[in-house]
Amino acid sequence: MLWIEAVRTLSADLEDPFELEFVWRNLHELNKLSWLNLMREKITDQELKLLTEVSKRLHQNEPPQYIVGWAEFRDLKLKVDERVLIPRPETEELVEMILAENEKDSLKILDIGTGSGAIAISLAQARENWSVKASDISKEALTLAAENAEINQANLEFIQSDVLDKITDSFDIIVSNPPYIAFDETYEMDNSVIKYEPDLALFAENQGLAIYQKIADQAVNHLTDNGKIYLEIGYKQGQAVQAIFQEKFTDKLVSIHQDIFGKDRMISVK
């Protein structure tokens, strides 16, 4: 059997048939040309066994990023596993908005619920004069985030904290992509997310609004006079999250921002 025949057979029922190629190429460090050349060769019994195992894991909805052990975020390569969420493209938009609106040197930044460290590491790399701290309730997530910071040569500090419970500083920018999915919304989620990604980073009480409320309650005492808050939100939560923060920050403008698909996806408080 040729490689191309094996790949066609084993990827036929996958939602994204290119996932099999993605995983194999990354596990074996093959570029596109090497992969195409491989397709014309005969597949060995051992290779077929390994390829079948990868296909099986993909058919069980295991995210390809978890199989290869990393994910891309902006220009970063981040280690990921079941301790953290896989970074999403919409979070890149949140980072880009922060960078576009803030160019001043020596700002103090806090990323709440950092997970893999995607937001904090991106900001620390893009603005070397910023002082960036990142917190998470999960010790396991912080361990992985610290590894990612070292891999990507980013200088930042990590703190284990439930939102701002153990934070004492004030910040010029507080950013968060918190858990925001309601427990009764699992029907809208992909099986791969439900089965493999950590519940702690996905779900929140009060129809997904509980962490936003806690951030609003606590950030009042941790924001500088001209400080700003940036948040990622669920696409149905814009008005609810806006109301939570407008109640706490009556002297600031709380705005809803859309992603590239026109869906409510971000909140700014400034």
From Swiss-Prot:
Q: Which biological processes are named by the entry's GO terms?
A: methylation
Matching Pfam families, A to Z? MTS (PF05175), PrmC_N (PF17827)
Instruction: Name the residues that bind S-adenosyl-L-methionine.
Output: 113-117, 136, 177
Q: Which reaction does it catalyse?
A: L-glutaminyl-[peptide chain release factor] + S-adenosyl-L-methionine = N(5)-methyl-L-glutaminyl-[peptide chain release factor] + S-adenosyl-L-homocysteine + H(+)
**Which is one GO molecular function term here?**
protein-(glutamine-N5) methyltransferase activity
Which residues bind substrate per the record? 177-180
Entry's Gene3D superfamilies?
A: DNA helicase RuvA subunit, C-terminal domain (1.10.8.10), Vaccinia Virus protein VP39 (3.40.50.150)
Q: What is its EC number?
A: 2.1.1.297
User: Which domain of life, per UniProt?
Assistant: Bacteria
Q: Which UniProt keywords apply?
A: Methyltransferase, S-adenosyl-L-methionine, Transferase
**What family name appears in the similarity comment?**
Belongs to the protein N5-glutamine methyltransferase family. PrmC subfamily.
Q: Which PANTHER family match?
A: HEMK METHYLTRANSFERASE, MTRF1L RELEASE FACTOR GLUTAMINE METHYLTRANSFERASE
NCBIfam families tied to this protein: hemK_fam, RF_mod_PrmC
Q: Summarize the protein's role.
A: Methylates the class 1 translation termination release factors RF1/PrfA and RF2/PrfB on the glutamine residue of the universally conserved GGQ motif.
Protein name per Swiss-Prot or TrEMBL: Release factor glutamine methyltransferase
Gene symbol? prmC
